From Swiss-Prot:
Protein name: ATP synthase F(0) complex subunit k, mitochondrial
Residue positions, PTM N6-acetyllysine: K16, K17
Location in the cell: Mitochondrion membrane
One Gene Ontology cellular component annotation held by this UniProt entry: mitochondrial membrane
Reported function: Subunit k, of the mitochondrial membrane ATP synthase complex (F(1)F(0) ATP synthase or Complex V) that produces ATP from ADP in the presence of a proton gradient across the membrane which is generated by electron transport complexes of the respiratory chain. ATP synthase complex consist of a soluble F(1) head domain - the catalytic core - and a membrane F(1) domain - the membrane proton channel. These two domains are linked by a central stalk rotating inside the F(1) region and a stationary peripheral stalk.
Membrane topology of the entry: Single-pass membrane protein
Tissue expression from the record: Ubiquitous. Highly expressed in skeletal and cardiac muscle. Moderately expressed in brain, thymus, stomach and testis. Lowest expression levels were detected in lung, liver, kidney, adrenal gland, spleen, small intestine and adipose tissue. In streptozotocin-induced diabetes, the insulin-sensitive tissues skeletal and cardiac muscle were down-regulated.
Subunit structure: Component of the ATP synthase complex composed at least of ATP5F1A/subunit alpha, ATP5F1B/subunit beta, ATP5MC1/subunit c (homooctomer), MT-ATP6/subunit a, MT-ATP8/subunit 8, ATP5ME/subunit e, ATP5MF/subunit f, ATP5MG/subunit g, ATP5MK/subunit k, ATP5MJ/subunit j, ATP5F1C/subunit gamma, ATP5F1D/subunit delta, ATP5F1E/subunit epsilon, ATP5PF/subunit F6, ATP5PB/subunit b, ATP5PD/subunit d, ATP5PO/subunit OSCP.
Transmembrane segments annotated in the record for this chain: 23-45
PANTHER family found in the cross-reference section: ATP SYNTHASE MEMBRANE SUBUNIT DAPIT, MITOCHONDRIAL, ATP SYNTHASE MEMBRANE SUBUNIT K, MITOCHONDRIAL
Keywords: Acetylation, Membrane, Mitochondrion, Transmembrane, Transmembrane helix
C-alpha cells in the first residue's frame, strides 16, 4: 500500500533495531548519533587544555 511503512513489517534484532535505514525511527537515530558524535568532537577540541610553549633557556 502507499503511505509510510509500518514498523511491524520489519523484524530487526540487536543494534539494527535502533539504527537502520528502513524505518523513520532508525533513520532518526542514525542522524542523532552522527550529530552527537560531531558535537562531541567539537567540544573535545575546544575544551582540551592548550599546550604551553616550553621555557627557552638563554
Amino acid at each position: 500500500m502507499a503511505g509510510p511503512e509500518s514498523d511491524g513489517q520489519f523484524q530487526f534484532t540487536g543494534i539494527k533495531k535502533y539504527f537502520n535505514s528502513y524505518t523513520l525511527t532508525g533513520r532518526m537515530n542514525c542522524v542523532l548519533a552522527t550529530y552527537g558524535g560531531i558535537a562531541l568532537l567539537v567540544l573535545y577540541f575546544k575544551l582540551r587544555p592548550k599546550k604551553t610553549p616550553a621555557v627557552k633557556a638563554t
